[in-house]
Amino acid sequence: LKTYSLDWDIDDPIFNFNLLGFNSYISKDYDFVFYLNKNCNFNFKRVNDQQIIENGITYVFSIFRFFLEKTEQKIELISNFSYPQIIINDNNSFFDKIEKVKILIPEYNYFNYFLKSDSLLDDEFYINLENLKKICKFNKINIDKIKIKNLENLILPT
């Protein structure tokens, strides 16, 4: 199996996007998407998951996508936490199964979800977010503070 490596620069156009982090009381991705769709007039749909392989373990992150016609931009909602993976130990320990979860962007591990967009959303969206009771916190994220290898996790298949 051949492995290829890409060298990125933070100024690469592929990293030209806005990122908003959400900390929510809603832990299930589909419930959170339903909540955003209902309260923010979005129409997110589930698309292929983001898969990251690390040390032979495949971690899966949910992705939802929506095309906002008004501004002609693609908006993606990405889970910051993978689905739990059950790892079976073969070293005869007392605990032979371990549940592992990977964080997509460890620099912002306090956010459950990320909203990735081509450009800034309108002010009405942010005002609406402030009134949503099930969102504890949301912040625009400076992607310059994210390590390149973690930024690569946000390059999603189209």
Indicate residue ranges for each PLM-predicted region.
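Glycine-rich, aromatic-bearing surface loops/beta-hairpins
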Residues: 110-158
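Short, flexible, solvent-exposed loop/turn segments with mixed acidic/basic and small polar residues
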Residues: 5-14, 99-110
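Aromatic- and glycine-enriched beta-alpha-beta binding-site module
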Residues: 22-57, 66
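Short, surface-exposed beta-strand/loop "edge" segments at domain boundaries and coil↔beta transitions
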Residues: 26-33, 70-74, 121-127
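Surface-exposed, low-hydrophobicity interaction/linker segments
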Residues: 51-98
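Terminal, regulation- and interaction-focused segments at domain boundaries
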Residues: 9-27
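Well-ordered beta-strand positions enriched in small/hydrophobic/aromatic, beta-favoring residues
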Residues: 20-22, 64, 115
